[in-house]
Regions:
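C-terminal boundary/linker of central alpha/beta nucleotide-binding cores
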Residues: 1-24, 36-39
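Residue-level detector of family-conserved "landmark" positions at structurally sensitive sites
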Residues: 3-4, 55, 68, 169
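Short, glycine- and charge-enriched coil/turn segments that flank and shape catalytic ligand pockets
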Residues: 6, 28-32, 134-140
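Residues that cap or initiate secondary-structure elements
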Residues: 17-19, 27-29, 155, 164
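Extended alpha-helical scaffolding segments used for macromolecular assembly and cargo binding
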Residues: 26-116, 121-125
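Internal alpha-solenoid helical repeat scaffolds
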Residues: 96-179
Length: 179
């Protein structure tokens, strides 16, 4: 066991010992019991601000609702901090029917593809956002999320050499951004 901090609260097991413990856990508990442990770990990590670990445990528990909520909250900041592969792994693990309903997850997919220069791959997500924002909602989408969507669309049009079209996306966008 190796200490990870000066206070003696965090320790790391040798990787072989950790593997032994994981094997014993899997051999002594049912799959459902292991899933419950992963759910508890996910919630603990979330409460302690360790979102990467929380998402990984939520996915290991097959708790896609918790994983999707956590990804919605953290995907964009992580993409902007160059953690694209981690976010991509998470996004691919979330069922497609959940992706289709989540503006934030679609936004993450769009940004991830745009930042990689994969414009055609971003288009389905940008188009889905247009559809999601057009639907009547009991809770309207936040103005900032819609403004971000407009920014993505403008970036896409600019990259296609259409600056005039990017300025004309939404006449109310400029007013909304100022309010």
């Amino acid at each position: 066991i190796s200490p990870l901090d000066d206070e003696g609260q965090w320790f790391r097991y040798h990787h072989l010992f950790a593997d032994l413990l994981k094997t014993r856990l899997q051999n002594s508990l049912t799959k459902a019991d292991v899933q419950v442990l992963h759910q508890r770990a996910a919630r603990w990590y979330e409460q302690n601000g360790m979102i990467v670990e929380a998402v990984d445990h939520a996915l290991a528990a097959a708790d896609h609702h918790l994983a999707a909520r956590l990804v919605e909250e953290t995907a964009l900041p992580m993409i902007l901090q160059a953690h694209v592969r981690t976010v991509e792994r998470w996004l691919q693990a979330i069922p497609s029917e959940m992706v289709e309903k989540s503006p934030k997850i679609n936004m993450a997919y769009a940004w991830m593809n745009l930042l990689r220069g994969m414009l055609p791959a971003a288009m389905p997500f940008i188009d889905r956002l247009r559809i999601l924002f057009a639907q009547p909602q009991t809770d309207p989408w936040s103005i900032s999320l819609q403004a971000e969507w407009l920014a993505i669309r403008a970036e896409l049009l600019m990259s296609q050499g259409k600056p005039a079209e990017s300025r004309d996306l939404d006449p109310g966008a400029e007013a909304a951004a100022r309010s």
